[in-house]
């Protein structure tokens, strides 16, 4: 191919240590891999113009995006460059060029703006680790000072971040490793019902702790076990005993945390209690409870910059989402006719026009992602002597291997209450039946047509405000390892399917957002409810604070409880005004009159049972949209009345007509 020398130009400002870079769909631009991206250099004019000269094949169409980030020294000599993405362009259609001359200059204007539209998104964890430290009143006040004079005091907290100095004695020794050069970053966030604030700096005396506010410190670092974190505590109400003219008025004491303490715990999440030392005497005067999570990059998987739907939602009429497939078959007033969360149930909902099917995923003992709603199930046990041939024994799903889940006679925990052992013994399908419970996530991804979207709820143990845990499970998998397995299964087997994650656990939502850049997640919340017990996590207690959390984490939106939305219809518009997508769930959604109201409110998706009761067998909205596009593009199809594309158009016809139609009905990215 004849070469063409292309000079790309972009305008924008950078933070210290950052560069602009570009990534695209050819070898010269890294094939959408940020690790192989091309950095730009600043123009000699000094007008915030950045350039890169790249040789491309003349006449070949090239697609590309710009991003802002850091290029780090390799971990090992001769190793691959490590790249951290801070902000990147996520327009549905990337920039494109088809060079037709020997030399060409492309002025791409302002970073983030393409075709007059600004679309930028935050990056994900590529090689760095993120530490989150939180102070909140979910269970009890985070700060406790024993001195009487502080008994009724309110406190302000300031966090200082420092790297520990390392011994340089071995610097002259031959070593294959090279020190990374990344400055640690600190972001402070305040989340409440009314608002969220994100700051990269703090007042001299920090921010005040409030019962209705979640305070969070986010630290990104390449050395998660080599940080010193210092909490300084100040009395918020400065009374007469405070010495006037003090350099730090109201300073009460200090607590120190070495990040190696967290690393040595080998946990992704937990709570640490640190002693607070008096400013003057250096004696212990109290303690602080620090809630933490550690977020690690997804191992063994490199995220592509080809496309991202993390914050994308195409405006459409409200979508019908099949709850657990064809519906709840265990605990609701009117049970579904097909067993929930089975391939048969999911297929049933899909055949009746469901745009998405919702189902629950967690792990078996041998770490296979399985589809099942509850954290526990009932194992059928045969007694040795008694006349009653079987007994039901409740056991956590995580204590059974995938093979055991397929082969053992298991039933839903409701069988313990009904004592209906005949019902639990009724189904004797073999392990390959689509009616079999506990299908693997991989089986589900491979079995259902790609034109039906998946709303994958990631199960995790939740604690109620009264201290009770879901399924009586106070311990569970390591959160990073748990999510790594589920996310890799989805990313490697999803094809072109539309996928939306969701979870009741706020930290799961945070991790899913930070570990990958492709699929969106919704924060599931029950808000104020008369049906379900209040959750311990402050971020889960009201729909408004759930919205603030979603904004802070920059996730797609929330999945709110219908009970709360019917009581407070204004929440729907409030979410939309904040740029959030809003789904709804709950038994109240099964009522067609409630669904009519919710659609009038403007929700984006409704999750409900027994779609087959309300909709005939029919193509879903994505198939209908695909058919309409084909009719517009192919005159031969304009008068066709057939409801599905596959009935009247062979793949060879699409190929001859140069129309690409993928399995999920997207003939180009604009139609996602």
Swiss-Prot record:
GO cellular component: cytoplasm; cytosol
Gene3D superfamilies for the chain: Immunoglobulins (2.60.40.10), Phosphatidylinositol (PI) phosphodiesterase (3.20.20.190)
InterPro entries: Carb-bd-like_fold, CBM20, CBM20_GPCPD1, GDPD, GP_PDE_dom, Ig-like_fold, PLC-like_Pdiesterase_TIM-brl
Enzyme Commission code: 3.1.4.2
Top-level EC class: hydrolase
Modification Phosphotyrosine occurs at: 608
Keyword Secreted set for record: no
Every CBM20 domain range: 1-113
Family: Belongs to the glycerophosphoryl diester phosphodiesterase family.
Protein name as it appears in the record: Glycerophosphocholine phosphodiesterase GPCPD1
Species assigned in the record: Rattus norvegicus
